Amino acid sequence: MDLIIQNLEKEYMKKDIPEIWPGDTVRVHYRIVEGDKERIQVYEGVVIAKKHGGIRETITVRKVVQGVGVERIFPLHSPLVEKIEVVRRGRVRRAKLYYLRERKGKSAKIAEREENEG
């Protein structure tokens, strides 16, 4: 039964998603439908969490707008997500970066990861 579900899900999974890790700064191009109009909204921020797996995989992206932290959860394999670009690789030692919610300024900065680092 599990194999049947995996094969079904594989059909709907996107293949062009880059490797994303918590701490990375990403730019998500998200399709928004407003009435009969459709537009692409670009949302750039730091990935603070990556959850689930397979077709249900989601990332939580956080950015600060006018001093207020804004978080948005994006399903990676949703047809509404046009594309995801990795702007910068971050070096962190945690899988969930929820502690960034309490931090601001320099203490909320994430060091850049070297390409040869794992």
From Swiss-Prot:
> Which InterPro entries does this entry report, sorted A to Z?
Ribosomal_bL19 (IPR001857), Ribosomal_bL19_CS (IPR018257), Ribosomal_bL19_sf (IPR038657), Translation_prot_SH3-like_sf (IPR008991)
* Superkingdom: Bacteria
PROSITE patterns according to UniProt? RIBOSOMAL_L19 (PS01015)
An example GO BP is: translation
Which keywords appear in this protein's UniProt record, sorted alphabetically?
A: Ribonucleoprotein, Ribosomal protein
Do you know which HAMAP family this protein is assigned to?
A: Ribosomal_bL19
> What name has this protein been given in UniProt?
Large ribosomal subunit protein bL19
This chain is encoded by the gene named rplS
